[in-house]
Amino acid sequence: MASTEGEHNAGVDPAEVPSVAWGWSRINHHTWHIVGLFAIGLLLAMLRGNHIGHVENWYLIGFAALVFFVLIRDLLGRRRGWIR
């Protein structure tokens, strides 16, 4: 009778990525959250500029909102176990 257990993948194969033995292959999600907040800050800081039209402002606000949405989705998804 065949087993119904699925095969579990431990992550990264050491043959493919030698640095996994040193623990460098895991993505640090907190670092990416900080980078996302920094990117939002940079986008909103560019609102203060020497441009006359407001089309650029709407693009900057839109991209900052998009980054914020992705950041919050990732943060909440990890807390609730939806994303590993």
From Swiss-Prot:
Q: Which UniProt keywords apply?
A: Cell membrane, Membrane, Transmembrane, Transmembrane helix
Its GO CC terms are: plasma membrane
Q: Does the keyword Hydrolase apply?
A: no
Where's it found, cell-wise? Answer: Cell membrane
Quote the InterPro entries the UniProt record gives: DUF2631
**Source taxon at top rank:** Bacteria
What topology does it adopt in the membrane? Multi-pass membrane protein
Transmembrane feature ranges: 27-47, 52-72
Its primary localisation, in coarse terms, equals membrane
Q: Does the keyword Transmembrane helix apply?
A: yes
Family statement = To M.tuberculosis Rv2876.
Name assigned to this protein: Uncharacterized protein ML1584
Q: What is the native source organism of this protein? A: Mycobacterium leprae (strain TN)
